[in-house]
Amino acid sequence: MNKNIFVACDVSSQKEILELLTQIHTRISGIKIGLQYITKHSPEEIKQLSKFNKPIFYDGKFFDIKNTLIESVKSLKDLNVSYATVHLLNGFESLKAASEEARKINLRLLGVSVLTSFDNYELEQLGFKYPVEEQVLRLIKIAEKANLYGVICSPLEIKMIKKVAP
């Protein structure tokens, strides 16, 4: 069985999540919590997930001004998370500073470029002048320069990304 799997805890009930993890924790590599979970559960409930001795991936997609981004990253230390996501649109300086703070607390920051639900039309409506593929590449280069641990991408983008950030 492939153990390179993080289970997404995108259900509302903490009881349900703990029961599921009790059943499958030996067959997974980690636990992913997204906005649905994060906004419903307390820091204490997030910490409860640590009892399974698996890395916790905090998929909060932080996107804010530099100081707030840095403080948000620092606050994750108390939650015992191993990975967290930041939007690459935060820009190089903010990402570099956040990456430096993350390394101090042994947190791996992963960059989110263009949401997979976006198409060229949507990007254009938001004022972006480049198509999705080119925008993704531009943001990936920023992530690499800012020394992020990695990026989140569509499986369709992997080949393209490896050309600019091996």
Language-model segment annotations:
Residues 56-57, 109:
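Hydrophobic beta-strand scaffold residues
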Residues 9-25, 32-50, 66-68, 162:
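Conserved alpha/beta-domain cores
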Residues 1-11:
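Boundary/entry segment of secreted carbohydrate-active catalytic domains
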